[in-house]
Amino acid sequence: MPTNIYVTEEELKKQEKIMKEIAEENKGKNLYYHIETYGCQMNVHDSEKLAGMLEKMGYKYTENLEQADVLLFNTCAVREHAEIRVLGRVSQMKELKARNPNLIIGVSGCMMQEKNVVEAIKEKYSYIDIVFGTHNIYKFPQLLWEALNSQDIVIDIIEDTKNVIEELPVKRDSNLKAWVNIIYGCNNFCTYCIVPYTRGREKSRKPEDIIAEVKELAQKGYKEITLLGQNVNSYGKDLDEDITFAKLLYKLNDIEGIERIRFMTSHPKDISDELIYAIRDLDKVCEHLHLPVQAGSNKILKKMNRKYTKEHYLEIIDKVRSNIPDIAITTDIIVGFPGETEEDFLETLDLVERVRFDAAYTFIYSKRAGTVAANMPDQVDDAVKHERLERLIELQNKISLEKSAELRGKIVEVLIEGISKRDSNKLTSRTRTNKVVHFVGDESLIGKLANVKITETKAWTMQGELVEVIR
């Protein structure tokens, strides 16, 4: 596996040329593609880039797998369950390939950065045409061209790139909201996490490239951007210029046309006063902070290599809420980490009760080969993990319900995102604190900011009445 390569301008021009050649060859043909995406928002945005390249090469999107000429699976390696699900799904494609031998099937993403997975694909899934990872998406046109012109499986995995690849075509899922990468990779090496091995070391995009992308989005009518990174708080540390994540937020806040700025994910050890003040003071930065705590026991946090304590985390929460009283705080929590006792788990429940998160994404610890935690003694019994997860979910659901109920009768600002999937007479909107509100309204309001009065609340969604359109 080649390590840490530098991608030259010549290489990118070569890929551009191949895209044009494939597009020319596809002229007049009705060719279709389908992409299935697993995992985080980074993967979702990677799939948007793959879709952008496919559209530039003359393919159109289809929901119908039977109609597809190119079928891609963009995979996630964070939890074992996700890997099993992906491989199960890929195995179902054998019959589809038998019915349509010209179908190109590709598997990409974080799972492909694991050597054992690539070997398994070669041995058990001979009908797969293309295998590539997270670092060479830019090379997809060439890989597709090779697959179209060969009977052999095309495998291209690199360990990392020294530079950030800019200006890949993007076919965005929304005309209103956009994902914007600001930093790739992770340097934290939490003992349970495979991400540093699949996504590489931290690489920040240059601020001028981010600003140019956001300005272009504003010109196209996008209202909301979400800044993406495994740890956005590390942004700029690897750059030669004087730029931090908070300073980047100030620059983006000045861009005309953008109404809302969100970001994810933040590591608690890197939360700065500067960032807290930026969220407080910048009118476009939404009052929502996703701050994964993972556990409430100092013993477990140390074993996880999280580099903060329960007390430090609670201090951060106090500082955030004293500066931004109405902020919504969400988190990630893992139960059943190796060595977690009942006392350790009770520390987690105590933290949840004290912080009162608006929502928590809760997971059972999943052993990942190649991580430090996979070889730790005292692995927790599965039945115990599931029992603890149920108790945690029960507590958090109660808190989420109570937090939502606090908004009943209040008027909140929402961005109207589209027609409700469950009731075509209603619109779906989102508050600045990232809560979903449904209300009766005309579809001409989509893309507008409005004030809505909350009439009913559940743990995750709310019902409201339109008060006024802001703009």
Swiss-Prot record:
Q: Which residues bind [4Fe-4S] cluster 2?
A: 186, 190, 193
Picking any one GO molecular function of the record gives: metal ion binding
* Superkingdom, taxonomy of origin: Bacteria
Cofactor binding mode, per the note?
A: Binds 2 [4Fe-4S] clusters. One cluster is coordinated with 3 cysteines and an exchangeable S-adenosyl-L-methionine.
> Taking every annotated instance into account, which residue ranges of this chain make up the domain MTTase N-terminal?
31-149
SMART domains per record: Elp3
Radical SAM core domain: residues covered: 172-402
Q: Which residues cross the membrane?
A: none
User: Which cofactors does the annotated protein need, by name?
Assistant: [4Fe-4S] cluster
The family database entries (InterPro entries) matched by this protein are listed as: Elp3/MiaA/NifB-like_rSAM, Methylthiotransferase, Methylthiotransferase_CS, Methylthiotransferase_N, Methylthiotransferase_N_sf, MiaB_methiolase, rSAM, rSAM_horseshoe
Q: Which reaction is this enzyme known to catalyze?
A: N(6)-dimethylallyladenosine(37) in tRNA + (sulfur carrier)-SH + AH2 + 2 S-adenosyl-L-methionine = 2-methylsulfanyl-N(6)-dimethylallyladenosine(37) in tRNA + (sulfur carrier)-H + 5'-deoxyadenosine + L-methionine + A + S-adenosyl-L-homocysteine + 2 H(+)
Q: Which UniProt keywords apply?
A: 4Fe-4S, Cytoplasm, Iron, Iron-sulfur, Metal-binding, S-adenosyl-L-methionine, Transferase, tRNA processing
Locations listed in the record = Cytoplasm
Provide a GO CC annotation, any one: cytosol
Entry's Pfam families?
Answer: Radical_SAM, TRAM, UPF0004
Q: PROSITE patterns this protein is in?
A: MTTASE_N, MTTASE_RADICAL, RADICAL_SAM, TRAM
Binding residue positions for [4Fe-4S] cluster 1: 40, 76, 110
Q: TRAM domain: from which residue to which, for each copy?
A: 405-468
What Enzyme Commission number does this protein have?
A: 2.8.4.3
| HAMAP family, per database record | tRNA_metthiotr_MiaB
Q: What does this protein do?
A: Catalyzes the methylthiolation of N6-(dimethylallyl)adenosine (i(6)A), leading to the formation of 2-methylthio-N6-(dimethylallyl)adenosine (ms(2)i(6)A) at position 37 in tRNAs that read codons beginning with uridine.
What family does the Swiss-Prot or TrEMBL record give for this protein? Belongs to the methylthiotransferase family. MiaB subfamily.
Indicate the quaternary assembly: Monomer.
Q: What is this protein called?
A: tRNA-2-methylthio-N(6)-dimethylallyladenosine synthase
Q: Which organism is it from?
A: Thermoanaerobacter pseudethanolicus (strain ATCC 33223 / 39E) (Clostridium thermohydrosulfuricum)
Tell me the lineage of the source organism. Bacteria, Bacillati, Bacillota, Clostridia, Thermoanaerobacterales
* Gene from which this protein is expressed: miaB
